[in-house]
Amino acid sequence: MDDKELFDRSIFEETNQLHLYDQLNYLKKNDLQKFRKLLNQVQQLDLRSLWLKYRNAKATSQENRKLSPSEVGPLSIVDTSDSSWWRTGLREIARGHVAALVLAGGQGTRLGFAGPKGCFRLGLPNNPSIFELQAQKIKKSLALARAAFPDQEASISIPWYIMVSECTSEETISFFKENDFFGIDKKDVFFFQQGVLPCLDISGRVLFESDSSLAWAPNGNGGIYEALLSSGALNDMNRRGILHITAYSVDNVLVLPVDPVFIGMATTKKLEVATKTVEKIDPAEKVGLLVSSHNHPCVVEYSEISDEACKATENVDGHKHLLLRAANIAYHYFSFDFLQKASLHSSTLPIHLACKKIPFYDVTSHHYTTPLNPNGYKLESFIFDLFPSVSVENFGCFQVPRRTSFSPLKNSSKSPNDNHETCVNDILSLGKSWILKNGGILSPSDCTYVSPECSLQGESLEWIKGKQVSNCKLY
């Protein structure tokens, strides 16, 4: 808001924020220091835009309309790899054209862990944290590229961009420093912070954290576009000559921060955006889906699709599959040109309402309240909300097996799924499959761990043929 709008009562009135106007005037008369503090926060708001986005999001959520089969259809899915993509991806890495970007703003609260998720240690041999595991994979991708293209410049690197939130920033940066950036040159690690949006009550009024502070929350993974621009990360990519960026969620323990095959596919097809998916098999599975709508890709939540569309099937090579089966696993490819354009249009992203229990300060009663039930909304934008700006011809939907690509760490051990134990088992099982595929000998109960320092995707294990492997770590 500009100075003129700040004291225009009609703007506060038409956007249901009179309590904010009244509090500003109260502090202006009674406490100038607190007034300036609150004023500085209000100046960051565009009340008209916020109110419009809130009303649109509210209307959409109340409408609760289900999409029919005529409104959404399957995207063309790439589910087999061209053998040339691996080498093409390694070539782009060797040329210094590739960067990794991790969305690491989440806390480990649901894991029973007091810290950023990326700092969580899985209990594998040598006890690496999630961040360290990803660093090992980045270094291995670079080593493979250098070996495949030894004539390229030796000083090339894979820069790692790490999006943190206000609550994870300090601890994440300290963790990297304490661990010497896990062997990656610190000049190749770029931390940047996602933005925040104000919390609202059920009627759309801004909530207060104190008498002179608004209640804020991270703005969702869609905040990546604006944050890349404002932090200087995009300028850094441009300076380095980055053309290809893979973005992923920190909590997928099987993730490949830089996947040569995926990058090779996107490079060969000259795509603006691509995403990895896994096949949805159960119509009742609660997962977002990549679909085509009006010749544009988009992600829809399971709750937005009619039962008829959810259960629709098609026959592929004599086997029945769900028609809408491309399940989103939050792993995306972006061309640098797309990110540049997206960063300039981030203000057009819609907001989504997450109903939560939000402690707040009541400026009328002057009491701080901790609610027992959900009382308001945290506002989020989603990274995939800009996907519809891309034509299906410039978008790639790449289907990968769950067992090799997706094992999210979401819950504590009290939950039967997506917990620490399931993640460790998935890592060990994948390594075991590589050993057996290469002719190694294992007992059924063996717990041998194949480190990313040894193999990224099962390559370079030919030496193990005919050898007995037992409960060890392969480096």
From Swiss-Prot:
CDD domains (alphabetical): UDPGlcNAc_PPase
Modified residues (Phosphoserine): 405
Keyword Transit peptide: no
Residues binding UTP, per UniProt: 103-106, 117, 194, 220, 251, 378
Keywords: Cytoplasm, Nucleotidyltransferase, Nucleus, Phosphoprotein, Transferase
Pathway this chain belongs to: Nucleotide-sugar biosynthesis; UDP-N-acetyl-alpha-D-glucosamine biosynthesis; UDP-N-acetyl-alpha-D-glucosamine from N-acetyl-alpha-D-glucosamine 1-phosphate: step 1/1
Pfam families attached to this UniProt entry: UDPGP (PF01704)
Any Gene Ontology CC annotation: nucleus
Motif interval(s): Substrate binding: 103-106, 301-302
One of the record's GO molecular function terms: UDP-N-acetylglucosamine diphosphorylase activity
Family listed: Belongs to the UDPGP type 1 family.
Protein name: Probable UDP-N-acetylglucosamine pyrophosphorylase
Organism: Schizosaccharomyces pombe (strain 972 / ATCC 24843)
